[in-house]
Swiss-Prot record:
PANTHER family: DNA-DIRECTED RNA POLYMERASE, DNA-DIRECTED RNA POLYMERASE SUBUNIT BETA. Belongs to the RNA polymerase beta' chain family. Mg(2+) binds at D462, D464, D466. Residues 1379-1399 are annotated as: Disordered. One of its GO terms (molecular function) is DNA binding. Zn(2+) 1 binds at C71, C73, C86, C89. DNA-dependent RNA polymerase catalyzes the transcription of DNA into RNA using the four ribonucleoside triphosphates as substrates. Binds 1 Mg(2+) ion per subunit. Its cofactor is Mg(2+); Zn(2+). Keywords: DNA-directed RNA polymerase, Magnesium, Metal-binding, Nucleotidyltransferase, Transcription, Transferase, Zinc. The gene is rpoC. GO terms for biological process: DNA-templated transcription. This is DNA-directed RNA polymerase subunit beta'.
Amino acid sequence: MNQEIMNLFNPTTPAQVFDQIRISIASPEKILSWSYGEIKKPETINYRTFKPERDGLFCARIFGPIKDYECLCGKYKRMKYKGIICEKCSVEVTLSRVRRERMGHIELAAPVAHIWFLKSLPSRIGLLLDMTLKDLERILYFEYYVVLEPGLTALKDRQLLSEDEYLKAQDEYGQDSFTAMIGAEAIRELLRGLELEKLEQTLRAEMQETDSDIKHKKLAKRLKIVEAFRHSGNKPEWMIMTVVPVIPPDLRPLVPLDGGRFATSDLNDLYRRVINRNNRLKRLMELRAPDIIIRNEKRMLQEAVDALFDNGRRGRVITGANKRPLKSLADMLKGKQGRFRQNLLGKRVDYSGRSVIVVGPELRLHQCGLPKKMALELFKPFIYSRLDAKGLSTTVKQAKKLVEKERPEVWDILDEVIREHPVLLNRAPTLHRLGIQAFEPVLIEGKAIQLHPLVCSAFNADFDGDQMAVHVPLSLEAQLEARVLMMSTNNILHPANGQPIIVPSQDIVLGLYYLSIMREGMNGQGMTFGNMAELEHALHAKAIHLHSKIKYRWEGMDETGKISKRWIETTAGRVMLGNVLPRHPRISYEIINKLMTKREISGVIDQVYRHCGQKETVIFCDRIMALGFYNAFKAGISFGKDDMVVPAGKWKIVDTTRTLAKDFEQQYNDGLITHGEKYNKVVDAWSKASEEIAKEMMKEISVTKKTATGADADINSIYMMSHSGARGSPAQMRQLAGMRGLMAKPSGEIIETPIISNFKEGLSVLEYFNSTHGARKGLADTALKTANSGYLTRRLVDVAQDCIITQDDCGTHLGIKMRAIVDAGTVVASLGSRILGRVPCDDVRDPATNAVLVKAGTLMEESHIDAIQQAGVQEVKIRSALTCELVNGICKMCYGRDLARGTPVNHGEAVGVIAAQSIGEPGTQLTMRTFHIGGAAQLNEQSFVESNFEGRVVIKNKAIARNSEGHLIAMVRNMVVTIVDPDGSERATHRIQYGARMHVDDGDMIKRGQRIAEWDPYTRPILTEAEGTIGFEDLTEGLSISETLDESTGIAKRVVIDWRGTRGGADLRPAIVIKGKDGKVLKLARGGDARYMLSVDAILSVDVGTTVKPGDILARISTESAKTRDITGGLPRVAELFEARKPKDAAIIAEIAGTIRFGRDYKNKRRISIEPVDKTEEPREYLIPKGKHIHLQDGDIVEKGDFIVEGNPAPHDILAIKGIEELAAYLVNEIQEVYRLQGVLINDKHIEVIVRQMLQKIEVTDQGDTDMIAGEQVDKIEFDALNAKAVEEGKKPATGNPVLLGITKASLQTRSFFSAASFQETTRVLTEAAVNGKIDPLEGLKENVIVGRLIPAGTGASMARIREVALKRDKLILDEREKQAAIVPSQPEPQPLALPPAE
């Protein structure tokens, strides 16, 4: 009996265990098999009794009872009648929960087309039938007939006939001589008549024959969909529906409101319309109504069903009573409020609370202060169970009363319950995983949560009113995970870059900085102390000052780990700091025996973590926090107006710059420079002045002054705050005490007149007005930035969510080469910082001795990096996520170190999500601006390069000429200057601009800081390579050249104008030629004439008949008029790169190495071809718009990958021309550059993981003997699998090239349709998936969250691995049984097997 009662509580339907989910088109039989009955009436519930009407939309007979175990009429009540069907009201006695599961159906009187397959582009029905959407709609909505069987008439198959034509044809050929139909029936017949196998063969044959690219594409599309239907087992006619399923009533509820009205789901209205029209159609058909009426009714039925499935997809949107569009089934899934994102991926939790946060400086790092009131509420169930266990209450009700009265014993129990039970704290927005961390609660009075100051930077929290949420992990497993993985003490390093994130900030930093100052001449200087007690005594007695220079006997550890003592020169403050430092052989006193700025402290924490481990680090952090707070309070550092020092030389600098600006104005008036150049120069001059004033100010403020006694005076407070890294930056100090500087207009341009005053002196009205411009734009930007940054993160997470560490080693030998990143001669990212925590592919050897420094396959630690840098290794080839050969996921070796732990990465780590968060989280710190060139203030134009090393100069691709002024001029674009040190290893390489003046020559010795070359950053020259006299070609006044008078100055200059639009100007090719003594055009050494083509806006620098020498300037293009592209910076640039968009004015890249040849012009484009060096290759041709400046001449030699036209290269071109490694290097460097500008550190591997996900597809170039279609994009995994199958069968495999997809596209094309559908374009993804009968293997994180299983990462990964092993064993056993059965057919029962041992 007991067993039976227990069974009653079991779910009515058994829970399904599944590994994959398949989606396909439902056949009418399938829909009927789901249904529990047909819905015949549009009624919902009776208005008097509130009981559902029979056969209506809420019918209890079909969908089940309203109350648990009670039929509708009330004849059978209670459990004992379970499963009986009442003979009076025909309702089954069961749980009312079945009303959430049971479906119904509507039998349609006429078939209708499913709108998704009709209207979702490309139209699937249209593709299959090879008809246009317009024609299909004409048939479906009863405008035209379609001929199905022309018979012996002159009509064609599938010809459309209007009403009149149809009647005429019937008269002409007789009624039964041909068949033509109209409406969905016609389409259904057409679809039913398709013979897919035959169709596939015809299409393949047609594809072989056709030459037209467009036709080939169209056929490929059709072939793909025909294959999809063949392989998936879907039948084409199922896209036309004869039965409509009705979803369970509890999923479209009707709720009575007070006042006798009802709130209902929109679906009920939509279903009602379908039923009404369907019933009306049935009646009309029974009555044999005229054709036209029936047809109209059928059309209305089609529209009603369309609206039910996807309202507004076709025709006008159907609105409810309040003019609001009704929410159809498709809308239920779509968008942020849809089922996927709202309910499946955005579930809410039950046990949580939220409150304002306040600072808790006396907490330990792993603690948080939880208000008692809050804890009592959150831990209620635990308290009830403890009260019960202790016998203080017998029922829940009693326990509830005790808790409500807040009896003393309740508080004691709360203390017990809370002990060692971590809670999760979360601050929105949770931009990365450190936004949720676990703490042990400490009960406090009051109503605010106390937060430890050191975790603020991880949460990005401050105490100006921020709120935080508290969540309680309930199950034991959850508590365990919270403690082991999420405890704040486990999150010391930042997952994005491996630097400590538990770093003191603000007042702690200030206190530690003050503590570590050393000042000359303070009292007690030179005293000696043996231990801490003596030192403290002297301090309290004021015999010495905290900052006095003293000698101290320090007890450290030597290499062997023994205590060793030595004398050190230090200050009392630094000894106090040294006292909290853990003792370890690798940690010397020297790391804190200096002025402690924020960066230094971060370094110390890093060292302590690396050498002493986590526990010591946590204790150390808590101690320095206490020390910092205490000393900040003792120091009494304040902020006063007189601490801001306006530099004495300010006005002198301002006056000089004003004169300069006047000069530029004058030069412009004299016509020597253009308006744009003047603007550039003025802005440049002012930004330099502003920097100089800032330098002067910093110099004055940072100088230590002496007091009367000769001791060092106190350091300036504001300088201390800024220098320590506690608050404020030199830029802010410049505005306070230097000069406010240049301001930007809302458009992003820079206003020429700077703000000369600073805030201390006060701004004039005009200056104030100018500065409001920029300030307002800043605020508007911030609002936009947050939304954009969040969207970028969402796209990144979506593309990378299924990237998980699944195996130890994929065994690949591939990798990418890493070298230091050098920008304009300075090392921006050293080789060491880039390869730390990665695995080398090959042994790393010392270039001098060839000894192995690091063996291949070793994870490189800090010690290895030191050795590599000492040896001067320039390049290391490392394993990378990009080259990992695992099918799903990445292997440990290719990923390397887990940055947040400093150890090799673990199995099941969700590296994709970590990468996405690391890139997305700093997004809000990036700027939103697109820089317009002109503001040199943002774009410190480089006008020279100087050497950062001593050594010898080596010039590659050397071509230097001495011009008529005697300067050495660089004559080629690919000239590279390398500085080589005495051992012969390269120190630095610099690319030299075309037309630059060289200060050194090949083989010269160079000193540090010496200039190598300089050039004018604002113009691009066109230089001559020959000596001779100038001649003009096609430079006709008024046609291709004009003397423009500058309006404001009245000075003439000669500029090439756009000659293509003028009459008779289309064939002109304006050029400057160099003639010899005989008056003929000179020939150049490299072949070709000395003829220099001019592009629009070139300003001539020479006249006919002038004599020139090699290296002289013939014309110049002002970069402002060469319209150097807008520089997209910040967030938009990162998004552009990840979306792999083609940039505006993209560069044109040479696909092969060879010689440039100018061909005949084509309309208004220049034709350039490359004659390949390798004669087996075809020459390549490029058409370039005439106005674009091509800086190559006829006969120039280009390498593969060189730019023919300058600009940003399109990433697809880089991939096609130079391959994956170059593309990865380009994307990583470009993205890093944006983040570096903002001072954000992100490890390269995160970007590599995302780029790996962008390269998952392959475009088939030749299909071989496989089923793939040339030109289609296939998943890498699928491609390899199909090829392997082909090779196995002895067929020819397909070939293909990798394709780069932007992150949005890549997310929509993942193998999991669940993941794609919940991202964007839900309808399209689901339609596509259903047609293909796709199977979702549920491998990623997102799909598993949607179906409500453990995600296959972290703890879920180990579960998945255990299941894998179990499945393998099951298979072995079954195989073994089959074998035994085959051997001994007579044996009745197979013997039990000895199981193979578990792995």
